[in-house]
A protein has these predicted regions:
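Amphipathic alpha-helical packing segments from all-alpha helical-bundle domains
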Residues: 108-135, 139-144, 170-184
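Amphipathic C-terminal alpha-helical segment
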Residues: 102, 147-164, 178-186
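N-terminal intrinsically disordered/low-complexity leader segments
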Residues: 1-7, 184-186
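Alpha-helical structural segments
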Residues: 11-18, 22, 53-76, 80, ...
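Helix-turn-helix
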Residues: 11, 15, 19-53, 57
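Secondary-structure edge/capping motif, primarily at the C-terminal ends of alpha-helices
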Residues: 70-74, 103, 107, 156-160
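Conserved alpha-helical segments that form or flank metal/cofactor-binding pockets of metalloenzymes
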Residues: 95-101
Length: 186
């Protein structure tokens, strides 16, 4: 008798991320995962208490992939650090459409922090270094930049628009310089 093939938690998460990448989060269910892994649904529910727990693991993995995009774009040194974060966000939207939608184009009205626009410390450090603005002004400056970047990224993620990277770079520079002027940072 052949030994049982052990399906690990990581196998399930990676397969689930693959399904989301190919189709969407709405297509993620135990049967689809089991079919892709060539197993029953039993290993899925042995490793995860619920599909919601698995969805959270998929979101965590998708965010890790996004963080990789950020790190690579910054490390390449093609753009100033702040601009590199915007370029990475847009590149992620273009290359990982469904993961981008999962992370950044979902209804958050039911979340506890709905309506808050707090940013992580790393982002705020980058904005501070780039602008020299005080804390509150800097946060609003970044919100304005992020809204612009998110608009471009959304057009890529939905297939509405496809621009070359030089044009995207120019657009981000123009928006950034325009906001700097608006904030009196010429």
């Amino acid at each position: 008798m052949a030994p049982k093939v052990k399906v690990t938690r990581e196998d399930i998460v990676e397969t689930s991320v693959g399904i989301v990448r190919m189709v969407s989060i709405e297509s993620l269910n135990a049967r689809a995962i089991a079919t892709a892994l060539n197993c029953s649904t039993q290993p899925i529910f042995s490793n995860f208490a619920s599909m919601e727990e698995l969805h959270l693991a998929v979101i965590e993995r998708a965010y890790s992939i996004y963080q990789g995009y950020l790190q690579r774009e910054v490390d390449e040194g093609i753009y100033p650090t702040y601009k590199a974060t915007g370029m990475a966000y847009i590149r992620f939207a273009k290359e990982e459409r469904e993961l981008f939608k999962l992370l950044f184009m979902c209804d958050r009205s039911e979340q506890q922090d709905f309506g808050k626009w707090e940013f992580d410390d790393m982002t705020l450090d980058i904005v501070r270094d780039s602008t020299g603005l005080d804390e509150n002004t800097m946060k609003f400056f970044h919100l304005e930049v992020w809204a612009y970047v998110h608009g471009i990224a959304t057009m890529f993620a939905t297939g509405f628009l496809d621009l070359d990277w030089d044009m995207v770079s120019r657009m981000l520079t123009d928006a950034y310089l325009g906001l700097r002027k608006q904030y009196g940072m010429e």
